[in-house]
């Protein structure tokens, strides 16, 4: 796997304009929708239990994000996820804050037990807590802890029968057999809320058009990281507000050529 190979997935997303069904959190809904539109995908935010199964059945991908967790949304996620499974729609799960509270951890473990996942995406602490491995966590954005990230990712992929994506200073993608590290991105991403949540939805757009989910995830992460680097180069001295606007611009303007030129991936 190389940057030339994965760069083609970006063009495919823009040509296909996939419908990405998001059941996400209230903090990031607008940013997620705008980010997907900028990329070239079609976002829909449908949460009502009366319609989620139908909406999920016609989507290119379904993204479940438990950032602002409520029982009615959990019910909707389960309905949507099972419909997606029945209709061969890939499901992505972002277990935001898993480990922060007992209820949040319970839900983070229940959803993968009930729904077949194409991708699980989180920081190291979240993924570790989903598979009941000890890792430090403080709040929903924590990811710093003691442990081997690659080992946790492989364990999650094996136990959950999915592609595990752990993001941080370096990103890891694995299906338990193939493992790739991506070294793109910028630290200013941590100063804008919702960049991780948007990333999961962007991976959803890539998964909708590329059925090799490892390749799709690596392509999405590399694209996202390169876009962040290009945006930061223009705005980092101004601050996160300017960066957020330019980042949306770069999600629209970053090309497959940029990925070939700036992408940093390593198969391990």
UniProtKB/Swiss-Prot annotation:
Binding positions (ATP): 121, 167
EC number: 2.7.1.50
UniProt GO MF annotations: ATP binding; hydroxyethylthiazole kinase activity; magnesium ion binding
Cofactor: Mg(2+)
Positions annotated to bind substrate: 45, 194
Disulphide connectivity of cysteines: none
Gene Ontology process terms (BP): thiamine biosynthetic process; thiamine diphosphate biosynthetic process
Pfam families assigned: HK
Reaction(s) this enzyme catalyzes, per UniProt: 5-(2-hydroxyethyl)-4-methylthiazole + ATP = 4-methyl-5-(2-phosphooxyethyl)-thiazole + ADP + H(+)
Lineage: superkingdom: Bacteria
Keywords assigned by UniProt, alphabetized: ATP-binding, Kinase, Magnesium, Metal-binding, Nucleotide-binding, Thiamine biosynthesis, Transferase
Pathway(s) where this gene product acts: Cofactor biosynthesis; thiamine diphosphate biosynthesis; 4-methyl-5-(2-phosphoethyl)-thiazole from 5-(2-hydroxyethyl)-4-methylthiazole: step 1/1
Task performed by this protein: Catalyzes the phosphorylation of the hydroxyl group of 4-methyl-5-beta-hydroxyethylthiazole (THZ).
Family: Belongs to the Thz kinase family.
Protein name per UniProt: Hydroxyethylthiazole kinase
Organism: Bacillus thuringiensis subsp. konkukian (strain 97-27)
């Amino acid at each position: 796997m190389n940057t030339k190979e994965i760069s083609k997935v970006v063009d495919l997303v823009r040509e296909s304009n996939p419908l990405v069904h998001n059941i996400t959190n209230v903090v990031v809904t607008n940013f997620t929708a705008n980010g997907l539109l900028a990329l070239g995908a079609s976002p829909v935010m449908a949460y009502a239990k009366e319609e989620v199964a139908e909406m999920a059945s016609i989507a290119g991908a379904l993204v479940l994000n438990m950032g602002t967790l409520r029982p009615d949304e959990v019910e909707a996620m389960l309905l949507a996820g099972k419909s997606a499974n029945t209709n061969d729609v890939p499901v992505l799960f972002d277990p935001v804050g898993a480990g922060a509270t007992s209820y949040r951890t319970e839900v983070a473990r229940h959803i993968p037990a009930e729904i077949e996942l194409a991708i699980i995406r989180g920081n190291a602490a979240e993924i570790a807590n989903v598979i009941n491995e000890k890792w430090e966590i403080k709040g929903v954005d924590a990811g710093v802890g003691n442990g081997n990230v690659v080992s946790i990712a492989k364990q999650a992929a094996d136990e959950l029968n999915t592609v595990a994506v752990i993001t941080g200073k370096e990103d890891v993608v694995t299906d338990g057999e193939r493992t790739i590290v991506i070294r793109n991105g910028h630290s200013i991403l941590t100063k804008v809320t919702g960049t991780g949540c948007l990333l999961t939805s962007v991976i959803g757009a890539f998964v909708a058009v590329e059925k090799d989910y490892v390749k799709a995830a690596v392509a999405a992460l590399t694209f996202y990281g390169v876009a962040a680097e290009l945006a930061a180069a223009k705005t980092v001295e101004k601050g996160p507000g300017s960066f957020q606007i330019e980042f949306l611009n770069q999600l629209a303007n970053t090309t497959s050529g940029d990925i070939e030129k700036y992408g940093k991936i390593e198969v391990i």
